[in-house]
Amino acid sequence: MSVRIRLKRMGAKKRPYYRIVVMDSASPRDGRAIEELGYYHPVEKQNQVKINENKFRDWIGKGAIPSDTVKKILNKNNFKVES
């Protein structure tokens, strides 16, 4: 089982927000998550990203691989993720 840290789309039409979640790589985008780590609100001007750093580091230590989009979002918001 390959585990990924990726985005799960939520919200209404034309007003999306995303949860940063840990999922099996074969799961559908909006499928059941193993654990929620935080959120990303692209429409908001302030407080766009919130993530539980301890849980994120724990999952990275267990071998979870963040998606490219999650890496970009977190690096853009001063949370360094190694490539």
Curated annotation (Swiss-Prot):
GO molecular function, one term: structural constituent of ribosome
InterPro entries registered for this protein in UniProt: Ribosomal_bS16 (IPR000307), Ribosomal_bS16_CS (IPR020592), Ribosomal_bS16_dom_sf (IPR023803)
Record-annotated membrane-spanning stretches: none
UniProt KW Acyltransferase keyword: no
GO cellular component: a single term: cytoplasm
GO BP terms: translation
Segment forming the signal sequence: none
Gene3D superfamilies named in the record: 3.30.1320.10
Superkingdom: Bacteria
Keywords: Ribonucleoprotein, Ribosomal protein
Family affiliation: Belongs to the bacterial ribosomal protein bS16 family.
PANTHER family membership: 30S RIBOSOMAL PROTEIN S16 (PTHR12919), SMALL RIBOSOMAL SUBUNIT PROTEIN BS16M (PTHR12919:SF20)
HAMAP family documented for this protein: Ribosomal_bS16 (MF_00385)
Name of this protein: Small ribosomal subunit protein bS16
